Amino acid sequence: MGVQVDKERCVGAGMCALTAPDVFTQDDDGLSEVLPGREATSGTHPLVGEAVRACPVGAVVLSSD
């Protein structure tokens, strides 16, 4: 299970980066993104579920890939 950030939905609130800073960061435009190399394995990280719930616009999603 992996995690993704939908850049079209992201408003840059940064809740995911605050909740799971070792999985998420914010780019130069302030939009959230998954840290390089963490996309495929981050779904099992203990705080990713919290980050998914914390996103105010639902831009952070778990994928079954």
Curated annotation (Swiss-Prot):
[3Fe-4S] cluster binds at residues 10, 16, 55. GO terms for molecular function: 3 iron, 4 sulfur cluster binding; electron transfer activity; iron ion binding. Electron transport protein for the cytochrome P-450-SOY system. Binds 1 [3Fe-4S] cluster. Its cofactor is [3Fe-4S] cluster. It comes from Streptomyces griseus. Residues 2-29 form the 4Fe-4S ferredoxin-type domain. Transmembrane segments: none annotated. Keywords: 3Fe-4S, Electron transport, Iron, Iron-sulfur, Metal-binding, Transport. This is Ferredoxin soy.
